[in-house]
């Protein structure tokens, strides 16, 4: 579960390495899970890229360390908390996505992120 001030790694090549959650988007939401959109501040970034340190960005959570329970009874858990930075049209800013992403992103209409990901779990 991601909440305010949680740190996440960035799973794309937009230029940011780590982001800190500022707010979970939605009506009075406290926690974010896989597929939720957050507002975050860039805490660590690579030089000469599209995103700079201290930029405020929107991102979608693609992996969480908290257990994700599916309707089939399966549960899945990732090794890290990760997000992909998105623009206003919910398309990723980067051109590549690193690491596996959860299948729930397809249900939330983030099909571009799912198509860029090397593995969908």
UniProtKB/Swiss-Prot annotation:
Q: What InterPro entries does the annotation carry?
A: Ribosomal_uL14 (IPR000218), Ribosomal_uL14_bac-type (IPR005745), Ribosomal_uL14_sf (IPR036853)
Entry GO CC = cytosolic large ribosomal subunit
Q: Which domain of life is it from?
A: Bacteria
**SUPFAM superfamilies, alphabetized:** Ribosomal protein L14
Alphabetical UniProt keywords? Ribonucleoprotein, Ribosomal protein, RNA-binding, rRNA-binding
Ribonucleoprotein keyword on record:
yes
Write one Pfam family the protein is assigned to: Ribosomal_L14
GO biological process, alphabetically ordered: translation
User: GO molecular function terms here?
Assistant: large ribosomal subunit rRNA binding; structural constituent of ribosome
NCBIfam families found in the cross-reference section: rplN_bact
User: Assembly state and interactors?
Assistant: Part of the 50S ribosomal subunit. Forms a cluster with proteins L3 and L19. In the 70S ribosome, L14 and L19 interact and together make contacts with the 16S rRNA in bridges B5 and B8.
Its job: Binds to 23S rRNA. Forms part of two intersubunit bridges in the 70S ribosome.
So what family is this one in? Belongs to the universal ribosomal protein uL14 family.
* Full protein name: Large ribosomal subunit protein uL14
Its taxonomic path starts at: Bacteria, Bacillati, Cyanobacteriota, Cyanophyceae, Synechococcales
């Amino acid at each position: 579960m991601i909440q305010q001030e949680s740190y996440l790694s960035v799973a794309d090549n937009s230029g940011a390495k780590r982001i800190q959650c500022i707010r979970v988007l939605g009506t009075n939401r406290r926690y974010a899970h896989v597929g939720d959109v957050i507002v975050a501040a860039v805490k660590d970034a690579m030089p000469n890229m599209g995103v700079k340190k201290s930029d405020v960005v929107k991102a979608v959570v693609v992996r969480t360390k908290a257990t994700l329970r599916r309707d089939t009874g399966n549960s899945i858990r990732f090794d890290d908390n990760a997000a992909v930075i998105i623009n206003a049209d919910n398309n990723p800013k980067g051109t590549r996505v690193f690491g596996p992403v959860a299948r729930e992103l397809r249900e939330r209409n983030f099909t571009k992120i799912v198509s860029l990901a090397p593995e969908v779990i």
